[in-house]
Amino acid sequence: TIALRFLLMPPFPRLLDSLGSSDKSYERKIKIIMLQSQLQSIVEKFAVSATVSNIRPLGSGLINDTYLVVTEEKDQPDYVLQRINHEVFPDVDMVMRNIAIVTRHIRERLIAQGETDLRHHVLEFLPTVEDANRLYVEVDGHYWRLMVFIDHAVTKQEVNPESAHAAGQSFGHFQAMLADVPCQLGETIKDFHNMEFRIEQLKQACVEDRAGRFDEPVVQELLEQLGKRAEAMTEAERLGREGKLPKRVCHCDTKVNNMLFSEDGSEVLCVIDLDTVMPSFIFSDYGDFLRTAASTAAEDEPDFSKIQFRQDVFQAFTKGYLASARSFLTPLE
């Protein structure tokens, strides 16, 4: 049996007190209490062997709703309860099946390498009470999963050469451990990193011209530059069809905040956010990291003069990546 005792603890009591005593505030209080009760009932659907003392919001992710599930026992881990956004990932079963294959394979590789601290180096998802092979539950049209919380770990938002090198090593090691995965993973977001598809989308956007900007000189200049690069941008897809370039298990969302660092920042502990793990070309992961990390501005920066390519981050990430990935890459790759 699962012993679950719910205590309304910070930050929710402070939030409740701050809402005031008006009818509208009272309704909000009731909704918060109902949310806590609902979250507790969802946790109970997983094979948790600890006493839950608190559930509170965690992180600032844009895709999934995430909560920290705090347990009372010192010898038991805390957990992370997460609602999967099935509008972004409509095939939840495929997402979790991919994750199960990947995390199981990584765990086996780490054990073979002599790693004993598995908890901090690979995500662990809990099965449901009703089905030991199922890693998510559906409640009122929403899909939830529960994983072990990795403590003594931090995420980073900013990138410097040191963290870029560590990220390169980590993502390269991630791919290396999965280079021999025997199972074919599903494509959780169709054509997510398919450059041929993306270029066709761009052409269609030009035809529709919804914003009425197609004839602007700056837009025409950008389209001309993209046209010059289109053949190189789609080379991977062509080589793949010719059988010259393999698709591998890739993360497909290689940002620096999709990995956990040790508290002192000296080591990458674990690659996280595995919803987009799927077959792709290795350039997807390599280039996707540099797309954000090596830029001096945000990806939606309208002032082009602020956008520069950071050679120091590029070189550090490349050295780190090749140090881990060189062992399995083909000469063409």
Q: Residue locations for each model-derived region?
A:
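ATP-binding pocket architecture of kinase catalytic cores
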Residues: 76-98, 104-186
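Catalytic activation segment of kinase domains across protein kinase-like and atypical kinase folds
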Residues: 257-296
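Juxta-kinase regulatory segment immediately upstream of eukaryotic protein kinase catalytic domains
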Residues: 33-54
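ATP-binding glycine-rich phosphate-binding loop
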Residues: 51-72
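Short, Lys/Arg-enriched N-terminal segments with co-localized hydrophobic residues
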Residues: 3, 20-33
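Active-site activation/catalytic loop segments of kinase-like enzymes and analogous catalytic loops
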Residues: 283-326
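ATP-dependent phospho-/nucleotidyl transfer catalytic cores
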Residues: 56-60, 82-93, 150-165, 169-170, ...
